[in-house]
Amino acid sequence: DENQPLERRYRQLRESLERVVREKIQGNSLQTTDLAARINYVATQYELDIKEQNQLHTFRLTSNDILNHRKFPAKEEFLRDLRAVAFAYRKMFAQDIPLKLFSVLPKQEITSLGKKEKKEYIRRIRVCFDYADDTYLYVHPVDIIADEPIRVVYNKPGINHEFEETIKELWRYAQLNLLDVFVDREGIYTPSFIVLEPDYLIDISSLAECYKDYGSHPANYFLSRLVPIDNARPLLLGNIANLFLDEWIHAGEEEPDYIDCMKKAFRQYPIELAACAELRDPSKEKEFAKDCRMHFEHIRDIVQHTFLEPGYNLDKKDAVLEPSYICEALGIQGRLDYMQRDMSSFIEMKSGKADEFSIQGKVEPKENNKVQMLLYMAVLEYSMGQDRRRMHPYLLYTRYPLLYPARASWAQVRRVINLRNRIVAAEYGVQFHNHSDFTRNLLAQINPEVMNERKLRGRFWEQYLKPSISRFREKLSALEPLEQAYFYTLYNFITKELYTSKSGDVDYEGRAGASALWLSTLDEKREAGEILYDLQIIENKASQVHKAYILLSIPQYDEMFLPNFRTGDVVILYERNHDSDNVTNKMVFKGNIEQITDTELRIRLRATYRNVSVFPPDSRYAVEHDTMDTTFRSMYLGL
């Protein structure tokens, strides 16, 4: 329709291509929601040459820019893209282009988007894996046009050899993020990081907990999701210590009172405290009370004295507690305990023990805690654009107390991301094969021989570490064949649902899953009613201890826009002042919709933010739906 705006015609053409490509891959083994990978797959299926493929990718990239409002549509470009799609359909459907359409198409190909100039260094690039030989990975870039696959060097000592195990797990059309890429004169890429399926976010604390005294096998991740926490006491103590930190950070002239703080703790965690089996023992209850008092005093000492010492870049007046981050670059997400608002310094707090045995007479951070710190540093670097060399990260062990300045080791970060990739590959395998035999072989790795990578021996291993691994194995082996079949089938079902909730549904029209937060264009979100934007603060009550909330005004959208939000929805709130702002480059705040009308939105925040500057009053905000992994955690535990 000539009378329709070009932008609308672009959207219709894009939807048409997405629908056709999705139909053409149905019943095939391709498991990806990414349009670039789907185009490559269909191009191979219907023998589109490299020029025809690139014309479709040119349309994909142009429509991305137009639908994200980064570019104004031009008629000449639209006709070029219409021609590319029409000629592709001609091959896919083995039918001639209707004469009415053919008559308006350009008679000759109009040159595609110009090739990007060769760069010597690329911060980050998304690619689609094709195949590998002994020297290179061969990949297709997602965001630029290339006439042939790009060669990527892997297993290079000192640069990316840590990803050797990741490479063995790759499958055709897998999505990869390549970070810190050096490009030589021949256009060969050498990345520092290879991140598999980055849209599948793994929680930082869950990843760090895979680092045990006996090794860091991916089976630790699967074991922890299937086994309930034996002793809730350390977790409770950690939560109460976080509450103490909050009180001391936001204390004015008057010091917080310990008894008042404990009353707050009982109001905040009544069921957890009442249900904790250890606290039913009077002697252990006394010990717990004593521990709480000790942590309270230690946190006071750190905040009132250590913070002020020269060399520590910490200012409690400009702190943010429990900020959340989503890092699509590395495929991870997490929440910090304490951060300076300018992101120059942050603290990860631990109420448990540090490593008291590795070096005699010296307390050192535990490996899993160091890993957690390193991942937060990497998130701030790759998501928020901070320079790791200028960061001041600290581990705070409130038990001693010890405020430990952490050092960056990017080789260790690469090893951790390799572990993340192996976990994601296993999750992909479970939902892709969806077969009991595959899952049986995967979970068979939960055994002491496989997981004891450091070959520990002696009393510590035999008495404290090995039994928890063996117990799961024994329980699973003791099941009847029918019970085992039920267990594996249900495990597959939950994992498939979890994978879909993160990466999206292959058969779903449009985008779904948590990854839609950064993969969908603004227009797609508007059309699905999945975003409220240009919100402004009416009332900021984020500092209230028990019912922290924020009241926002909803602007007048056009009448075609129908928001898909209701009371009780779990949401993400973030600053959105530019079209480029999204959940992967902004601090995010999680909460629930408490009340919504046509003009106002009230969000109950999950955490209290007493620093008013966290929510600048002149800023504009956006709200989108959030997904919660905790639901799946309880499903796995139900097994």
Where do the language-model regions lie?
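A non-catalytic, helix-rich entry segment at domain boundaries
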Residues: 244-321, 507
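Accessory interdomain/linker segments of ATP-dependent helicases and helicase-like nucleic-acid enzymes
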Residues: 93-145, 441-579
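Amphipathic alpha-helical interface elements
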Residues: 1-101
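Short nucleic-acid-contacting surface segments enriched for D/E, G, S/T with interspersed K/R
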Residues: 120, 157-179, 564-566
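Pre-ATPase regulatory/linker segments immediately N-terminal to the P-loop/RecA-like helicase/translocase core
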Residues: 217-220, 396, 401-402, 410-414, ...
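Contiguous mid-protein beta-loop-alpha structural module that forms a pocket-lining wall or clamp
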Residues: 390, 400-463
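OB-fold/S1-family single-stranded nucleic acid-binding modules
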Residues: 172-204
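Mg2+/Mn2+-dependent nuclease catalytic core
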Residues: 141-171, 314-423
